Each structure stands twice: as C-alpha cells, then as structure tokens.
Amino acid sequence: MMEMIQIWAKILEPVLIHFIAINIVQMMGLHADAAFLTTMAAVMVLPFFCYMMKKDGCFQKKRKTLAIGKAVEIALLGIGANAVCSILLNLINSRAGFSNDAQEALFGSSFAVQLVGIGIVVPIMEEVLFRGLVYNRLKAYNNEWWSMILAAGIFAVYHGNPLQILFAFPMGLLLLAVYEKEGTLMGPIVLHMAVNISSILFTAAGSL
C-alpha cells in the first residue's frame, strides 16, 4: 500500500507543482486577466519541469527531429480535430447546459496574451507536464495502452469542468498517439499549439 502511494506521489508530483504555481500567481494578484495568470504559472514551472525530465533521464534517450512537412501535417490534424470536437461539444452543451466559465475567461483576455500565452507557452508547458513527465512516469509502472488511458484521464480531469473533460480526454489520447508515433515531444507540442491557436482564431473571428 505504501509503495503504491509513493508511486502515485511521484507520478502526480509535477501536477501538484503546477497547481501550487497557479494558486501562488493568483494570490500575488499580478493581473486579473485569466490568460495572463495561466501563462505566468506556465513560465514559472517550465524550468522545473525540464529539470525533472532531465533527472528522469528523458534527455538521455536518442532525440528524434520533426520534419517541417510532418509538423504541417500534425498542425492540420490538430485544427481538424479541434473543429470536430468543438462542433460535438457545442451540440452537447446546447442540450446539457454545462458551464464553461473557465474557457470563456481565457478567451476574454487580450488577443496578444491569448496568442502568445495560451497559443504557444501553455501548450509547451502542458506537453512537458502531461506527456513528458506524467505519461513517461506512468509507463515505468504500466503497459503503454493503460498508461495512455490514465494519462489522458489525468489531463482531462485537471481541466476542471465536465465540458472541458469531454474535450480534453480524446484530445489527450490523440496527443499521446502523436507522441508515440513521432517519438518526440515536438509532435504533441505542434498539435497542441494548433488546437489552441485555431480555437483562439475561431473565437476571435466569431466575435467580429
């Protein structure tokens, strides 16, 4: 029992660090802008997460590169997946009436902060956190498929509300599939950026 607790403590350690960082930034009252606060928390924890990946031995493995053509394919996949998921979630939300206040707060921030923070910085941090650390630590104790399900579940639940969980779980599986296929975090980072940036652009276009 104690060994299991220690295993899960190690797996979820980076998630707890990010949770603490978010609360520290909020308590500091640096800015009321939700996207700015989220970005600041990401900037705070990213160096620690990179150090943790290095300590885990992730950087000792042979690193694969991502060709430009492949990056474009992955970005288009992300845009398409985001469009499909958004349509389905809008249909679900129109019937179930789930609250999506957190997402609306992020998209209510200034366009520049959204684009740089939510579109670039946060995807990098979340991929290092959820795919680089949580998933790889899960794989040390479980088979690949079970690790993917657990990692996607943790990624989804961490997003907080029912509507985002419905979006984040399949997206988490897709990000992991790209990670496994490409053998580099650059794959899911590009996909995640494409998803977030396309969401920002679609939302901005819809508000015109």
Where are these regions (language model features)?
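N-terminal, membrane-interfacial amphipathic/helix-forming hydrophobic leader that caps
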Residues: 1-71, 76, 80-84, 90, ...
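Hydrophobic alpha-helical transmembrane segments
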Residues: 8-12, 71-76, 112-116, 145-150, ...
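Membrane-interface helix/loop boundary segments of multi-pass membrane proteins
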Residues: 17, 128-150, 177-184
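Functionally important transmembrane alpha-helices
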Residues: 19-27, 152, 157, 163-208
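Membrane-interface starts of transmembrane alpha-helices
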Residues: 30-41, 109-114, 143-151, 184-187
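Membrane-embedded alpha-helical segments of multi-pass membrane proteins
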Residues: 39-45, 116, 166-174
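Juxtamembrane helix-loop-helix connectors linking adjacent transmembrane helices
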Residues: 58-122, 140
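Active-site His/Glu-centered metal-binding helix of metallohydrolases
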Residues: 124-129, 133-134, 161, 194, ...
